[in-house]
Amino acid sequence: MQGLAGSVRVAALDIDGTLTERRGAARLDGCSIAVARLLNDLGVTSILMTGNSLPVARGVAVYLGLEGPVVAENGCVAVVGGERVHICSGRPPEGLVKRIMELGFKPSWQNEYRYHEYSLIPVKAAPGIVERASAIAEEEGYRAIWSGYALHIQPPGGGKARGVGEVLARIGAGWSEVLAIGDGENDVEVLARAGYSGAPGDAAEQAKRAAKIVARSPGARGTLEIIQRVLGGARAPAC
């Protein structure tokens, strides 16, 4: 999989665990800047795909210097060419959210800025808590997605693959032209569909199995490693 710079038009990148220092960390790695500059230098369109709220995702894109589309809330909302696109409709009902919170979750501060998803943080680790939350959500026709950082409750019709697919259609690109990199269970569908895909070295096992390349390094350093490998050893700024 060497020397494919001409075949890759789009890089779809997760944020947390992919541009941060490692999986579970919230601090951006200095290598994330090198990733952004390398993609810009190569003329590859970036798509940030994240479970974060849209303001957070757009803020990360702006400060990294990535001018491509943004997919937020695990595919429920996107910004393409300055236009906000809603892929999901509505929000989970308060009663459902309350039932799931009673398992041992608390609200994320980002919920105030979300259009469709509701995000919950585990109060403490408890075996089977995510599986029980998913079962409750499914009973009422909703999805509960674990990102490695939070539990995301979303209406039907979401998912990162759905959001990225909507963006690709709008920019005239196909899945075969995409290099996707992600570390979480919520990235698996995109990793499986993309023509080229990778996971940082400390990614979730589901992501590693779905990816075509698994980096040696964690977090953003692993992401940079994957990009350089797929794009023929392209040189990146030091980080």
Swiss-Prot record:
The keyword Ubl conjugation does not apply. It catalyses: 2-phosphoglycolate + H2O = glycolate + phosphate. The active site is at residue 14. Substrate binds at residue 160. GO terms for cellular component: cytosol. One of its GO terms (molecular function) is phosphoglycolate phosphatase activity. Its cofactor is Mg(2+). InterPro entries: HAD-like_sf, HAD_sf, PGPase. Mg(2+) binds at residues 14, 16, 183, 187. Its EC number is 3.1.3.18. Keywords: Carbohydrate metabolism, Hydrolase, Magnesium, Metal-binding. Belongs to the archaeal SPP-like hydrolase family. Catalyzes the dephosphorylation of 2-phosphoglycolate. HAMAP family: GPH_hydrolase_arch. This is Phosphoglycolate phosphatase.
